[in-house]
């Protein structure tokens, strides 16, 4: 995060960190001759804390999707064209990604901006997270303009899908599968094991449901 060499700006670190929330490895380190880039070394630590807190809150979803991808021999992070092969705009989109079955991300990549244009191949739910709070708003299929301030992360939940999120915590030891909530309007199959053994039996699969979920 921030690049292995050089001196990344605060803005670059925050934007890169917001993208890394969804990647398997979320780590910032650097070459010996480059200045340290730990988050606490930058001013305005509250923005960094905001993004890092989202990583912890999304771990139930991310862990579940990583395991499903491994067990199904399918990529977890994919270009839009993988899931929407009949949509020419989705096939041409090279700066947005599917993360698991439920989420599409569209990171802000340009310096000095807080907005960007995104393409949504179906109606979705836009989720904005910042400083401990989630806000949700339905958005229509097609091109949209989103806004994400430094310290905020925006992502999209696919129609009929859901994302489990945990409560704020500062360590994976504090994650509690019994206190999750669902974002979105669908069902979600959660993968949750003991965190220690390699037993992946069916006993570790649970089905979370919202009231508006059929069945």
Residue ranges and their predicted role:
Residues 152-215:
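Accessory, solvent-exposed terminal regions and/or long lumenal/extracellular loops of proteins
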Residues 1-152, 194-196, 201:
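Catalytic-domain carbohydrate-binding cleft regions of carbohydrate-active enzymes
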